[in-house]
């Protein structure tokens, strides 16, 4: 709660990254040190745990709160509804773990309908992976372009279909009257 209050005062973005059991493989951690891989997703719970914070600061225009997780089961069930409801909440793409076309697709498919694309944080960089930043940005852009194009084409198709039904209804109404 204190971190959110301070973020509203200083304008810094608050980020929460639960859902990872770090350094799961003891031998790798012993040989190479901490944070060198072996991060395994674990179950997370946001809705109850963030309720007090979001009631206090979730509608505050001075706060931007980015939520991340490796726990894919929470994308649609908790994260997207929270981001769709609270103006301060943004969804962070779990690219550091699911840095693949399929991983990014699962994230977008499970969150876009409820939270929208505008409620996502975009592509944040991690300086620990400095050499891979360019490749990861390329992957994200190469994936996002067709995703947006397909979404636009699908939405346009729905609009044309709705317009056609409307026009057919008008013709039927005229024929009956």
For the regions a protein language model found, what residue spans apply to each?
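Divalent metal-binding pocket/active-site signature
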Residues: 1-74
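Short acidic/histidine-rich active-site segments
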Residues: 15-19, 66-70, 91-95, 117-136
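Histidine/acidic-residue-rich catalytic or RNA/ligand-binding cores of hydrolases
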Residues: 24-33, 75-83, 101-109, 130-146
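Short acidic (Asp/Glu) and glycine-rich catalytic loops that position anionic groups and cofactors
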Residues: 28-33, 59, 87-90, 120-127, ...
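A long, glycine-enriched binding/interface module in the latter
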Residues: 53-58, 73-94, 105-119
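Acidic, glycine-enriched catalytic cores built around paired aspartates
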Residues: 55, 60-63, 69, 79-82, ...
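C-terminal helical cap
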Residues: 70-76, 91-109, 158-177
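Mid-to-C-terminal alpha-helical segments outside catalytic/metal-binding sites
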Residues: 117-118, 135-177
